[in-house]
């Protein structure tokens, strides 16, 4: 009896990485510079200047009619419409992929608005879709943080797995004298190591084989995820490498509570069975009871004394990530004013207290009309006043003014034939959605993440 072993499906698994916006394009450039193998790179941007300088072999100009190559102006709704305009081009570029990584910086215009649209298209092609995005620094301001929260919420609906990198944690990791380029490289390494690790898993010859079907089992429809790679050598190399792999300080989630874990150990010919057991025990203990570990090992003589541990953990209850998404949007409540008016006033004091409260109410309303954040839900009258007043703050020369006024409805896109309500949170009146377009210093820049823009020169 003859047996035929067909390994073509495994060896020919196609992985594509698409960088969206300025930060996404920078991440793609970094991966190309680092020599990541086994994947195809795509850059998508509304900014033609940034797109022309990108090193990806496939480039997509998003919304050429809408933005004329000048960027999204830090407005997510513009990035969204630009991606919808270029839907067919995006679909053609993504076809044929088994796995698609979408990377972007959340908080700006193109990355925040276009990434969810691209993720939806990617899922419709049948590919395993993974999002790897950054949350902005706190010092970038509340408006950008709020935009990021909205973009992440949209993206979650269309990706199988989502990895969120917290830029704020770069401040805790690097020395004060660390150059900015080196600091951002640490964030890019999360994506690079994850992509390279998965590529290596499905193309290498293993003693205990892992293939693309295993990757799909762990990552399909799983939500928040952790991706990490650890390297170590010496006596306790496997233990140290495994601990490094499961404790990436930049990620918003931990492995605790993971339901699915893909664990692969690569070492030289001297890799022992007990070392493999040590790695599995560490992961199992960190993840908790009920975790399903899919385990693999491979031998690479070129590693010498070094071992490489790759961990992909999914099905995580992302409470920490949810808290992180809410944190930038918090604002002080009004306890101070309430403490003033709560005490029982005397008859002689009553008119003055009432007058003070009235003046304070006026000040609060005026302050809220120029705020970049939605007012708290405990003051419904202030929220209504803010909405009414914001129309007067729109830049009268802005091409988006008329469009924005007309689009205070569930869907922001008029020419969409179907699924019109799927990308509506960028224009809704809900306090959690993005506020109306306001004139700000961000409008002077076409870069999605201004703190990333200098990285184009490397």
UniProtKB/Swiss-Prot annotation:
Biased composition range(s): Polar residues: 368-379
Q: Name one GO cellular component term.
A: cell division site
* Superkingdom field: Bacteria
- SMART domains membership: Tubulin, Tubulin_C
Keywords, ordered alphabetically: Cell cycle, Cell division, Cytoplasm, GTP-binding, Nucleotide-binding, Septation
- Family label: Belongs to the FtsZ family.
What is this protein identified as? Cell division protein FtsZ
Organism field: Lactobacillus johnsonii (strain CNCM I-12250 / La1 / NCC 533)
């Amino acid at each position: 009896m003859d047996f035929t072993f067909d390994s073509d499906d495994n060896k020919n698994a196609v992985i594509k990485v698409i960088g969206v916006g300025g930060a996404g394009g920078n991440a793609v450039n970094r991966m190309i510079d680092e020599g990541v193998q086994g994947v195809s790179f795509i850059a998508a941007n509304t900014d033609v200047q940034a797109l022309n300088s990108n090193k990806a072999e496939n480039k997509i100009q998003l919304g050429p009619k809408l933005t004329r190559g000048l960027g999204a102006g830090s407005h997510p709704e513009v990035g969204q419409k630009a991606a919808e305009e270029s839907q067919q081009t995006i679909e053609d570029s993504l076809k044929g992929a088994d796995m698609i990584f979408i990377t972007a910086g959340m908080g700006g215009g193109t990355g925040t608005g276009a990434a969810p649209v691209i993720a939806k298209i990617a899922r419709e092609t049948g590919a395993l879709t993974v999002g790897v995005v950054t949350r902005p620094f706190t010092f970038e301001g509340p408006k950008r943080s709020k935009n990021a929260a909205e973009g992440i919420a949209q993206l979650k609906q269309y990706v199988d797995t989502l990895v969120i990198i917290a830029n704020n944690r770069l401040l805790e990791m690097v020395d004060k004298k660390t150059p900015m380029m080196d600091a951002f490289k640490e964030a890019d390494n999360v994506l690079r190591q994850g992509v390279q690790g998965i590529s290596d898993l499905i193309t290498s010859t293993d003693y205990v084989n892992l293939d693309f079907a295993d990757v799909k089992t762990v990552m399909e429809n799983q939500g928040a995820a952790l991706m990490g790679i650890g390297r170590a050598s010496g006596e306790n190399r496997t233990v140290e490498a495994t601990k490094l792999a499961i404790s990436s300080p930049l990620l918003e989630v931990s492995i605790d509570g993971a339901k699915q874990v893909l664990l692969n150990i690569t070492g030289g010919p001297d890799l022992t069975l007990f070392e493999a057991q040590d790695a599995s025990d560490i992961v199992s203990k960190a993840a908790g009871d009920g975790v399903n570990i899919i385990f693999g090992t491979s031998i690479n003589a070129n590693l010498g004394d070094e071992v490489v541990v790759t961990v992909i953990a999914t099905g995580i209850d992302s409470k920490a990530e949810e808290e992180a998404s809410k944190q930038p949007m918090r604002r002080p409540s009004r306890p101070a004013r309430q403490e003033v008016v709560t005490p029982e006033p005397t008859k002689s004091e009553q008119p003055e207290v009432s007058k003070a409260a009235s003046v304070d109410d006026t000040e609060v309303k005026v302050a809220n009309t120029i705020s970049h954040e939605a007012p708290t839900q405990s003051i419904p009258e202030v929220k209504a006043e803010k909405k009414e007043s914001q129309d007067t703050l729109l830049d009268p020369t802005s091409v988006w003014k008329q469009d924005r006024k007309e689009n205070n409805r569930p869907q922001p896109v008029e020419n969409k034939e179907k699924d019109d309500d799927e990308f509506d949170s960028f224009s809704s009146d809900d306090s959690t959605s993005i506020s109306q377009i306001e004139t700000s210093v961000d409008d002077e820049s076409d870069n999605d993440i201004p703190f990333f823009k200098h990285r184009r020169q490397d």
